[in-house]
Swiss-Prot record:
<dbReference type="GO" id="GO:1990904">
    <property type="term" value="C:ribonucleoprotein complex"/>
</dbReference>
<comment type="similarity">
    <text>Belongs to the bacterial ribosomal protein bL33 family.</text>
</comment>
<dbReference type="Pfam" id="PF00471">
    <property type="entry name" value="Ribosomal_L33"/>
</dbReference>
<dbReference type="GO" id="GO:0005840">
    <property type="term" value="C:ribosome"/>
</dbReference>
<dbReference type="GO" id="GO:0006412">
    <property type="term" value="P:translation"/>
</dbReference>
<protein>
    <recommendedName>
        <fullName>Large ribosomal subunit protein bL33</fullName>
    </recommendedName>
</protein>
<dbReference type="InterPro" id="IPR038584">
    <property type="entry name" value="Ribosomal_bL33_sf"/>
</dbReference>
<dbReference type="GO" id="GO:0003735">
    <property type="term" value="F:structural constituent of ribosome"/>
</dbReference>
<dbReference type="InterPro" id="IPR011332">
    <property type="entry name" value="Ribosomal_zn-bd"/>
</dbReference>
<keyword id="KW-0689">Ribosomal protein</keyword>
<dbReference type="InterPro" id="IPR001705">
    <property type="entry name" value="Ribosomal_bL33"/>
</dbReference>
<keyword id="KW-0687">Ribonucleoprotein</keyword>
<dbReference type="GO" id="GO:0005737">
    <property type="term" value="C:cytoplasm"/>
</dbReference>
Length: 60
């Protein structure tokens, strides 16, 4: 039988540059495998409030 999906968790990515500029932050939700990726994710995603791609870091 197949094993359960307990290794994959849902995380939230939040824009880091919008806070510095005083604009509303953009948030994305995604999943990650906590066994393969133990550190926090940092991805470049589009922020519609700033109308450009910015760094989004994983928050708790």
């Amino acid at each position: 039988m197949a094993k359960g999906k307990e290794n994959r968790i849902v995380i939230t990515l939040e824009c880091t540059e919008a806070k510095k500029e005083g604009k509303p932050v953009s948030r994305y939700t995604t999943t990650k495998n906590k066994k393969n990726t133990t550190e926090r994710l940092v991805l470049k995603k589009y922020n519609p409030n700033l109308q450009r791609h910015t760094l989004h870091k994983e928050i708790k």
